[in-house]
Design a protein with these regions (language model features):
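N-terminal intrinsically disordered, cationic/polar leader segments
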Residues: 4-11, 27-30, 39-74
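Compact soluble domain cores
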Residues: 19-27, 31
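Acidic, low-complexity intrinsically disordered segments
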Residues: 14-17
C-alpha cells in the first residue's frame, strides 16, 4: 500500500463530499425558503453516513445545520 496515494485519495474524496454536500444543503434550504416551507431561522438535525462496502465500513456522523445564530436579533 502506498500511504501517499491512499491519503491523497481520501482527501480528494472528502473534499468532493464536502463541496457537494454543502451545495445540496444550500439548494434545499433556498428551495424551502422560497416555498415558505421554513422561515429561515430553524436548526435541523443532520446525519451523514459513510459507507465503504468493500471494507465493511459504515459510520454515521450526527450534527446539526443552523440557519441562524441562536439569540441573534433579526
Amino acid at each position: 500500500m502506498n500511504d501517499e496515494v491512499f491519503n491523497i485519495s481520501i482527501r480528494k474524496f472528502l473534499k468532493m463530499v464536502g463541496v457537494s454536500s454543502q451545495r445540496e444543503i444550500e439548494h434545499a434550504v433556498a428551495r424551502a425558503v422560497q416555498q415558505a416551507a421554513i422561515s429561515g431561522t430553524e436548526t435541523f438535525p443532520a446525519r451523514m453516513t459513510l459507507e465503504i462496502e468493500g471494507l465493511r465500513l459504515k459510520a454515521e456522523f450526527d450534527g446539526e445545520v443552523r440557519l441562524e445564530v441562536p439569540g441573534a436579533a433579526t
